[in-house]
Amino acid sequence: MAAREQAALESRHREAADGGDPGAASQLGALLLRRGELEDAEPYLRAAAAAGQRAAANNLGVLLHQRGHRAEAAQWWRQAAVAGSAPAAHALGLQLRDQGEEEAAEYWLHFAAEQGHPLGAYALGDLMEHRRDVRAERWFRAAADAGHREAAYRLARMREAAGDKETAETWYRTAAARSHARAALRLGVLLEERGDHDEAARWYRQSAQNGEARAACALGFLLRDAGEQSAAAEWWQEAAEAGDGNAANALGALYAGRGEAAEAEQWYRVAMEAGDQNGAFNLGLLCAGLGREAQAEQWYRRAAYAGHREACNALAVVLLQRGDESGAEPWFSKAAESGSVDGAFNLGVLHAGRGEQQQAHEWYARAAAEGHGEAALQLAVAQEQRGQLSAALDRYRQAAAGGSAEGAFRLASLLDRRGDADAEAEHWYAVAADAGHRRAQVRMGVRAAERGALEIAESWYRRAAEAGSRSAAFNLGLLLARQDSETEAVLWYTRAADAGHGRAALRLALLSLRRGEPVQAESWCQRATEYGPAEVAERASRLLGALSAELSA
């Protein structure tokens, strides 16, 4: 309505109201109330309300409530509500709820809701949900159907909590389409969980543009996973500057991964200042990586005292490494009791080191139940030592599935010894070998050689030998010797012998003899005698005796 028309309408209302028209007084009072002219509005509203105008009684209640006259406001709202005003019933219900009079509040909110008042239906649903009343969903639905976006969001949350994601998605879409930022965020989460990343990104972006920092953070992670690190950093920075600690931590981790420690530290501090104790913990990790151990301990301690369970574990590790076992144990306990899987495992290690096997077993079992591969490995080793082979196999499988290369190797070895699951044994040897387990690499080499796959065998032996396995170096030497590559074979025999491999030393002694180098042969014999095992030492000793006699003749 144009300003001139508005002024003319107000003039007509004022003239009629001053002439005693209660309807005009009600409309004029409402107009003045909307403009914030409370002093001018009040007499018109009072006159109209006294004449039985229920809209005026409701608006008079609003005016008095704004001025802090809550008791008188309630009186006028009650009068209007009794006369059938749904807005007044809603307002009265809210005030009664805030005063703790929930039974009376429910009555008036129900009155408003039954008349189709969406705010009344929403407030009634809110009251019922607070009391865990299942009828809350009905009233949220009524409000949502009438266009109330917060009700649609709350209804979606209820359906999601009940496991009905399909209905939840429908209501999230309804609320998000009305620019509800949190609904757009939750819709994005649901879509991301089922792999619809493009649509999830659209809703995250809409939510972020409507001021939801968590959506900007989530969008950053989605972009990072798609390889768009620069775009991810922009959204994380926007979220971090809006106070999202998770985004600040992500930004810190991004810079830390690039080796930009100063920038990483800056954002970790922003996270900490936002109340996210991951910031303090990450500062500890950053300082530890830079060799600033004292500072690392301070940050771990700060995060640990704030209840960060992994910081408790990290602090305990620092204390244990410097010999303070009594100081470490309470922090391991706090970490474990708070749900840190590593804390539970480390507490098990601590008890095992003292010979307290029962306590160690309990903590290993707790960590293993949460998927800790090394904890499952410790349990499996103990079971195998007790002869509980079936149970040990199950635990080794759990350890291997949890990422333990040693668990995978031991599982394969046990299956190998049983001889009834060769394919599975091969699989787990391969898993361990691919993870860099040297003995598994040697076994893969041996198995390949046994089936005549010499190139594959050589590849596995080389990987293990180059990683420091003396058995692999010896086996590689044998393989090369059979392929007439004696010069390289000698290099690997020497590497194995220098690492204490008796058979390699004996092989070098025999090669030295064949070359007419008795002094060198004697030296290798002495080392083979020293290194063993027994049968090698015995052969080397006999050869050494013959060499000594020859050299002294």
Locations of regions flagged by a protein language model:
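Residue-level detector of the short coil/turn that links helix A to helix B
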Residues: 36, 68, 100, 131-132, ...
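Short helix-capping/linker turns of helical repeat alpha-solenoids
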Residues: 19-21, 51-53, 83-85, 115-117, ...
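Terminal, low-structured helical/coil segments at or just beyond the last alpha-helical repeat
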Residues: 1-4, 527-553
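Conserved alpha-helical positions within TPR/SEL1-like repeat arrays
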Residues: 23-30, 55-62, 87-94, 119-126, ...
